[in-house]
Regions:
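Short, charged recognition helix plus adjacent turn
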Residues: 2-9, 20, 88-117
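A short, Lys/Arg-rich alpha-helix, primarily the initiator
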Residues: 10-43, 121-134
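The alpha-helix within a helix-turn-helix
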Residues: 37, 48, 77
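Key DNA-contact positions within bacterial/archaeal DNA-binding proteins
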Residues: 45, 56, 85
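Recognition helix of helix-turn-helix/homeodomain-like DNA-binding domains
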Residues: 52-68, 93-95
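Short, basic-rich loop-to-helix N-cap that marks the start of a DNA-contacting helix
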Residues: 65-78
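Long, compositionally biased
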Residues: 79-80, 104-133
């Protein structure tokens, strides 16, 4: 698979767009989530157990039959101990806004991701700084 940096380089050059589009993989939320689970050696059941989501809702989000809110996608990312890059990819592929360090709540979430906080510890941190817990 071609890296994002390589794609940006090609897009900046005079490479024909059709040639570039042919090498870009078809990415969707479900396949990216599955790849993250596989890379981390995790099962959906284990990850879902570490969230505040109802099991049915969580499985529907993971299977792509229901759109997950930003909070729910972040819960999955925390449970999988994803880094910021992978979390933002999941957020983008689920049509949610990316985490942005200049937004205070997002800065707290980035901090929690980078320090591998679980959902409980992340919610404590959010509440301590006058933000709602992830629901």
């Amino acid at each position: 698979m071609i890296s994002t940096t390589q794609l940006i380089t090609l897009l900046n050059q005079s490479t024909p767009l059709e040639n570039i589009l042919e090498i870009i993989p078809d990415l969707d939320f479900v396949s990216y989530l599955e790849a993250c689970l596989e890379k981390k050696g995790l099962k959906k059941k284990e990850v879902i157990a570490q969230t505040n989501m109802q099991k049915n809702d969580a499985y529907q989000i993971c299977n792509g039959t229901k759109k997950g809110s930003k909070d729910k996608i972040i819960q999955l990312a925390l449970a999988m101990r994803l880094n910021l890059h992978d979390t933002n990819n999941l957020l983008s592929l689920s049509n949610n806004g990316l985490l942005y360090a200049k937004v205070k709540k997002d800065a707290i979430l980035i901090y929690a991701l980078q320090h591998h906080y679980n959902l409980f510890k992340t919610n404590e941190l959010l509440i301590a700084h006058c933000f709602d817990a992830l629901d």
